[in-house]
Structures are given as C-alpha cells and as structure tokens.
Regions:
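Short, charged, amphipathic alpha-helical segments
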Residues: 134-142
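Long, hydrophobic alpha-helical segments
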Residues: 47-51
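Short, charge-rich amphipathic alpha-helical segments embedded
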Residues: 145-158
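Recognition helix of helix-turn-helix/homeodomain-like DNA-binding domains
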Residues: 26-46, 67-70
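Charged, helix-prone or intrinsically disordered regulatory segments positioned adjacent to compact structured domains
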Residues: 52-131, 160-162
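Short basic helix-loop element that most often maps to the first helix and adjoining turn
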Residues: 4-26
Length: 162
C-alpha cells in the first residue's frame, strides 16, 4: 500500500477533507485540496518533513504512513519473503490453518520481532475480550510503539541450549 493510500485512509478515518488537511499542513487555501489529492493519488510523494507533519495532523506515527508495497498480492508475498530472509518469519500450518511464526533462534532481531508480535497479540486479545475498545486498539496500532507498555515479552532461551 503506497503512502498516498495511507494518507487517504487516515484522512477519511479522521473525518477530514483534502482542503482541511492541506490547510492544516500550511498549504494555501486555493491549492490545499489539489496538493493533498496529488499526494493521495501518488503523483507526488511527500518528503520526510511533510510525512512527519502529516502524521502529526492525522494523529498517527510516521511509520503508520510509510509502509512497504503491498498493493498487490505479489507485492505482499515478496514483502513476506523479505521478512522470512531478514527476520526468520516462517509459514507453517496449525490445526489445518496457514499461520506465520517467527523462529526466535535465528538472531537477536528475530527475538525482538517475536517480542513485538507478542505485544500485538496481547493488544488484539484485549480487544477480543472487550477489555479495550476498537478505538483504543487502533490508537495502539497507529501510534506503535508509543503506547506499547506491556514489556511482558517472552524470554528467549540462549541458542546453545538447542
């Protein structure tokens, strides 16, 4: 998903018009909506400083706007393959369902990714149990890692034990 689609998604989520968001970013009123449309359609790509400003106005982390190319299933698959290469993500089967898991023994990076995924799973479980609202869950996701206070990560055994 390109950054323009994420801008569009969060703008609509916040109930903003293109003109409103553009003006909040400091664009002139006459061209604010046109500028935003250019970013949303991908004809222009915001630089880092504008991405940071967009994130602030949209009340999300800049990381929530900048995501890899997952506009197609093939692009998504290659993103997953990269995660397999770099972070030990593995595809497997459990109870007849395809699932993704992290081989925590691969490296320190995979152990850290596992911790982060466990934290995400805990937040999702809290949502499922009704302990937090969808709004709170989305706030947790869209500001990640800012509100990740769990620190209840699984301790990874040393590799020499295997």
């Amino acid at each position: 998903m390109a950054i323009g689609e994420r801008i569009h998604f969060f703008r609509l989520l916040r109930g903003m018009t293109q003109k409103y968001l553009g003006m909040a970013l400091g664009f002139p009123e006459k061209s604010a909506d046109v500028r935003l449309a250019q970013y949303e359609t991908g004809s222009r790509t915001p630089k880092a400083d504008l991405t940071a400003a967009l994130a602030q106005v949209l009340d999300v982390s800049p990381h929530a706007l900048s995501v890899p190319d997952i506009d197609s299933y093939v692009g998504l698959m290659h993103t997953l393959f990269t995660l397999e290469d770099n972070y030990g993500l593995k595809v497997s089967e459990m109870d007849g369902e395809v699932c993704l898991k992290v081989d925590v023994r691969k490296s320190k990076d995979t152990a850290r990714l596992h911790e982060m995924l466990c934290s995400w799973q805990q937040a999702a479980a809290m949502l499922e149990a009704g302990e937090i609202s969808k709004e709170d869950y989305d706030k947790w996701r869209y500001h990640y890692p800012e509100f990740d206070k769990s620190q209840n990560y699984v301790k990874v055994p040393p590799q020499d034990l295997f």
